[in-house]
A protein has these predicted regions:
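Sequence-structural signature of mature extracellular/luminal beta-sheet repeat domains
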Residues: 1-158
């Protein structure tokens, strides 16, 4: 993981991560990232150290943290959003809906009410991507199903 300073200098913040994706900052002062073999890393930027503290067994894509520093991880191959506690305990938070299960959850973001929005990439080069809303506790619904080609990221405004 690196930092670009002044558009000309790159500083390595931490080394040794496996294809980090979905980097997120926690209120606890750590950065978090996932790896392509399901690794979930906690990163101490000040010390330049990381530790793998959880594993989903899939490919960690986007992630978001709640106010309690639980990490919600989009795992493409497992077609699941996992909830990861700071202890490293991994549990299934959502697999989509009964009628429309996840095919490839890609990125997650919280709103101020604690709803987790997840972009579902759909099929490669297809226009069947959509956005799900997962309410606190895990109840999941399709929030937006307008034809979208491979959504890969989202941002929630006030």
């Amino acid at each position: 993981m690196a930092l670009l300073n002044n558009d000309t200098q790159v500083s390595v913040l931490v080394d040794g991560l496996d294809h980090p994706e979905g980097i997120a900052w926690g209120l606890d002062g750590y950065a978090y990232a996932g790896g392509e073999a399901g690794q979930v890393y906690r990163i101490d930027i000040d010390r330049g150290e990381m530790v793998q503290f959880a594993d989903t067994g899939g490919f960690v894509l986007g992630m978001a943290l709640d106010a309690q520093s639980n990490i919600y991880v989009c795992d493409g191959p497992n077609k699941t959003v996992f909830k990861i506690a700071q202890s490293g305990a991994v549990s299934t938070y959502s697999t989509g809906t009964a009628d429309e299960p996840f095919r490839g959850p890609n990125y997650a973001a919280f709103d101020v009410k604690g709803n987790l929005y997840v972009c579902e990439s759909g099929d490669w080069h297809g226009d069947n991507g959509m956005i799900y809303r997962i309410k606190p506790g895990g109840e999941t619904e399709v929030w937006d199903r307008r034809p979208t080609t491979f959504p890969n990221g989202l941002c929630i405004g006030p």
